[in-house]
């Protein structure tokens, strides 16, 4: 843990600790924050859950990083850590970051370039036939509602994992992703996943590098 002042208690049998950070609790109890943290873990075990910031919290630095041509903005690592991370919506957060800078009249790149960095640039870098809208190509499209960027994209919630008997962390950004088409077939329609996705073939295919 880099800074216990950045770690906020989300769940705890002692409800008075929820919403507070470990550093404040330690000061209140006049103990070292590491001792406080370990004592709480021993006392509450897995019933103690907390949220912490591990990076990308300095927006000025983040804006510099996303402008660097050596930075490839692809996907997050959240899918490998379903119980303790949820930033599956990394591309949406990137677009909101760029839109916010433009709204403050401090633009760092156009939205068109930001979208290209998420699509065409990656197709070129990986050498796959993807990331562009051209006549005769597969129709792989995402339709976003710009008004949806007004919500907090860092919010996380719990959702049941079908057939696993446990919950995972998810991002829910209602109204932002309106439609998704994969190979010309609707995968998301009016913000809802279509029943055919994952149950019928034809939504995509292997894309070899060239």
Task: Report each predicted region and the residues it spans.
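A general structural motif at alpha-helix termini
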Residues: 40-41, 118, 140
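Active-site neighborhoods of metal-dependent hydrolases
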Residues: 1-108, 147
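C-terminal cap of metal-dependent C-N hydrolases
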Residues: 64-71, 90, 143-199
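Conserved helix-loop functional segments at active or binding sites
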Residues: 97, 101, 120-124, 128
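Short, surface-exposed, low-complexity cationic segments
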Residues: 195-210
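Flexible loop/turn segments at secondary-structure boundaries
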Residues: 43-48, 80-84, 124-125, 149-152, ...
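Acidic, glycine-enriched loop/beta-strand segments at the rims
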Residues: 48-56, 62, 109-113, 123-156
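Hydrophobic, well-ordered secondary-structure elements that form the walls
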Residues: 30, 77, 95, 114, ...
């Amino acid at each position: 843990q880099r800074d216990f002042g950045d770690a906020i208690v989300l769940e705890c049998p002692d409800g008075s600790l929820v919403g507070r950070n470990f550093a404040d609790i330690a000061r209140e109890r006049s103990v070292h924050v590491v001792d406080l943290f370990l004592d709480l873990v021993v006392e509450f075990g897995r019933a103690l859950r907390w949220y912490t910031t591990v990076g990308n919290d300095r927006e000025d630095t983040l804006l510099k990083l996303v402008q660097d041509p050596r930075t490839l903005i692809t996907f997050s690592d959240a899918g490998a850590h379903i119980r303790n991370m949820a930033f599956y919506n990394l591309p949406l957060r990137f677009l909101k970051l760029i839109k916010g800078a433009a709204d403050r009249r401090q633009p760092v790149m156009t939205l068109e370039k930001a979208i290209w960095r998420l699509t065409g640039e990656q197709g070129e870098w990986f050498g796959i036939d993807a990331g562009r809208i051209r006549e005769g190509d597969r129709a792989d499209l995402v339709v976003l509602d710009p008004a949806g960027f007004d919500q907090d994209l860092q919010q996380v919630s719990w959702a049941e994992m079908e057939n696993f008997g446990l919950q995972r962390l998810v991002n829910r950004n209602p109204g932002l992703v309106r439609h998704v088409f994969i190979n010309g077939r609707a995968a998301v329609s009016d913000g809802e996943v279509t029943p055919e996705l994952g149950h019928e073939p034809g939504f995509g295919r292997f894309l070899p590098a060239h």
